[in-house]
């Protein structure tokens, strides 16, 4: 359970007192060995029960468990920083060599993958896979880089026999959304969860009785509140947010998991269709 990542990425979901607690913990994570809930409550001018409830909201049994987990996470994080300090920095600069940029990008993508997989609710993922597998029609929505992720997923799902509607034009996305029916599924991909085009499509899909699955960040957002199910992605972008590379890496990791899970549900037939598709493409290449 990555509590530090949860607090950094879900600040918009916190109440005023919860935000005080999160800010304090993030600012003093290196000093938590000497921090008690009593002293913390006194310093923040809140009740001890508020601190316990905050810990439980994050998934811990109580403050003691949360405090010990944060101490451990901080220790591991410091060790990782020491390991990479010789050849890596925190962001890409104009002075970096190509090799240095490659190392930084590689590390950024690895962190995005690790944190996304570590925070994944696998029971929820299994529910989502089962829902998608039974859907008469699957619509995938996204804008910009998220649209590319959606396009990739749509090709994969069509390859194993699913009916998928994935259009880049947001006007067409909205038109498809308002025509969905009960039993259909809309997969909405947006890291911010606040793109008006995607939110509008999600609202239209919900109105028609379709199930909305959001692939989005942990932060509170209109899309997150609208969705029936959320699959969380974690991404710490560098100062040079070149096409949101680590965000797309995190999103692709989730969509690839969805696809492999779908293949696993009906592996023999899915693999047969994948092979048949490859054979047809080979014939096209020969002509």
UniProtKB/Swiss-Prot annotation:
GO biological process per UniProt: carbohydrate derivative metabolic process; N-acetylmuramic acid catabolic process; negative regulation of DNA-templated transcription; regulation of carbohydrate catabolic process
Recorded GO MF terms: carbohydrate derivative binding; DNA binding; DNA-binding transcription factor activity
Keyword field: Carbohydrate metabolism, DNA-binding, Repressor, Transcription, Transcription regulation
Functional pathway: Amino-sugar metabolism; N-acetylmuramate degradation [regulation]
Top-level division of the source organism's lineage: Bacteria
The keyword rRNA processing belongs to this UniProt entry's keyword annotation: no
Positions of the HTH rpiR-type domain: 1-77
Annotation: DNA-binding region: 37-56
SIS domain boundaries: 128-268
Quaternary data: Homotetramer.
Function per UniProt: Represses the expression of the murPQ operon involved in the uptake and degradation of N-acetylmuramic acid (MurNAc). Binds to two adjacent inverted repeats within the operator region. MurNAc 6-phosphate, the substrate of MurQ, is the specific inducer that weakens binding of MurR to the operator.
Protein name: HTH-type transcriptional regulator MurR
Origin species: Salmonella arizonae (strain ATCC BAA-731 / CDC346-86 / RSK2980)
